[in-house]
């Protein structure tokens, strides 16, 4: 097409999350994307109107994206496979996917159509600044990306400064189902690490552990991402559902003598709240939960409110944590 003949004057090369050099059109007006973490960051830098195609994972949280994604924008199935025919028909300027979305296949299938594929792993907490900058570069929103990054990084710096010489407090982290914890390399590991927690399973070989091992390790705190539903939703869980999850934890065989249970040191986070800003919102809650006395100027609920209202453009809703955090906590 004629647009391709002049492409050499209107392209640029970016480096994606996994170090691939990708040639992109100078202006991106229509992007197909996968993964809610990517969708949230793109929204947070002010480029939501450039999203032309989404996977099922993004599509199903209608309220979280203001119902802007319609069924004809779907590029993937409920099972997570991508529909390359649909993407080719859509002919976006770029497909932005995650490393775990089989990007090699995407690259191969879309090359004949001249649709570039960018890998952006927004679910990795430790890559938040790099991925925000990458998306800022892709959409020409560098200034917004810079502002978003510094909002969160300044708070991480505060946590690091305040807790520099403080012994780490032990935490058992659980994701959704009993015994599903986090280890180095897993999606949740850095969220816990950046909160200066001592993850009791940091040397475990797999993310699924035996429940009785938690008893032996006797953590001082328990943090659980509580929704049984795998999908993230902006609508908070019902309070009675949170209470039931809390009670179920306390009633696990042999757990009543555990320090965390005796002290009522249990924090439940909704899927949505823990995940904000590549899980840095989760980090803020966990840090404050573990070290309330050391972090007087960190207010996680305030951070969550700003994430939701300023960056995602949504109304603030309470109920995403249990026990509830007040704005000034």
What are these regions, as identified by a protein language model?
Residues 17-19, 73-85, 204-211:
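Short helix-initiation/N-cap motifs at beta->coil->alpha
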Residues 10-11, 21-23, 105-180, 198-202, ...:
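Extracytoplasmic substrate-binding proteins
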